[in-house]
């Protein structure tokens, strides 16, 4: 554990950057995602690598008349065809990891289906590439899967989360969202899994020469504190432990997501232009280009909307 998601991501990416630079000095890598969060994209660029966002084509489809979907279309999904095409084009050796943001933060918090997560895992592992999750809103995504994906209606959020996490080789998390805590984060990888195998070094006899887990642990301890508390107080750790359980409560999650949908539908019915539908589970987004009919400065239009009083 660590005190925030940004620190978790920083620790992970610093070690990935160091290992890749030692093995392949000056080499430029490509790292795809369904939608890189801004700090993830920044970390990748600082590595000298290229972030690629493989958004799903569902984003381009028209909203149904009346603004209602029978089932959530999972607009946060990754385009699997583009993923495989990218890997084969640049070469698997030039794609060290694949990221998946759950829910898809850059795409207005849109959810990612279990079927899509499963396919991302299949394609990444086909080419021996580790899959890393950014799971700030993992429970929220599991709620959307339960409510909209066939075969999950009778499963609990915790059961769905267990399956979802089974498909990743490593993950980072900001625990301030679905951890219900005022601070906290996590960085984790599967013990002896694909991430560990690909980023550890081994002697000729198969024994471990350099363990990536040890490198991550040393980095965390030197910057943020021992991995048993990660710079967090006992009170914050206890709040986080309770919050992770609370996020699995269906009633709570249903109310939270329904509030967003209610507000988004209210805007839509009132004629507000640019409302993103269906709403995600943590916010309502408005497309500023549509809202202002392209008449406002692209650099200030969002700020104008957020500060103007009616």
Where are these regions (language model features)?
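Conserved PLP-enzyme active-site core in the AAT-like
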Residues: 2-274, 298-301
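Conserved PLP-binding catalytic core of the aspartate aminotransferase-like
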Residues: 274-310
């Amino acid at each position: 554990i660590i005190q925030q998601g940004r620190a978790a991501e920083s620790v992970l990416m610093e070690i990935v950057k160091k290992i890749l630079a030692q093995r392949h000095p000056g080499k430029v890598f490509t790292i795809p995602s369904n939608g890189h969060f801004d700090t993830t994209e920044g970390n990748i660029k600082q590595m000298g690598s290229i972030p690629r966002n493989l958004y799903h084509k569902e984003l381009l489809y028209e909203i149904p008349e009346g603004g209602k979907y029978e089932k959530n279309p999972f607009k946060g999904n990754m385009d699997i065809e583009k993923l495989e095409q990218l890997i084969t084009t640049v070469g698997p050796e030039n794609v060290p990891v694949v990221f998946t943001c759950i829910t898809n933060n850059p795409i207005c918090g849109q959810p990612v289906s279990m079927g899509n997560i499963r396919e991302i895992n299949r394609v990444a592992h086909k080419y021996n590439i580790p899959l890393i999750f950014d799971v700030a809103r993992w429970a929220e995504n599991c709620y959307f899967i339960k409510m909209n994906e066939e075969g999950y209606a009778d499963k609990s959020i915790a059961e769905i989360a267990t399956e979802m996490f089974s498909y990743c080789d490593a993950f980072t998390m900001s625990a301030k969202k679905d951890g219900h805590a005022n601070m906290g984060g996590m960085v984790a990888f599967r013990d002896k899994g694909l991430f560990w195998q690909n980023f550890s070094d081994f002697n000729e006899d198969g024994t471990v020469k350099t363990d990536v887990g040890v490198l991550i642990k040393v980095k965390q301890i030197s910057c943020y504190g021992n991995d048993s508390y990660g710079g967090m107080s006992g009170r914050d750790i206890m709040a986080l432990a309770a919050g992770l359980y609370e996020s699995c409560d269906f009633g709570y999650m249903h109310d939270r997501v329904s509030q967003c949908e209610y507000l988004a539908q209210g805007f839509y019915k009132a004629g507000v232009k640019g409302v993103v539908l269906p709403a995600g589970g943590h916010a309502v987004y408005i497309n500023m280009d549509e809202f202002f009919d392209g008449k406002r400065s692209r650099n200030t239009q969002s700020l104008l909307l957020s500060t103007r009083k009616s």
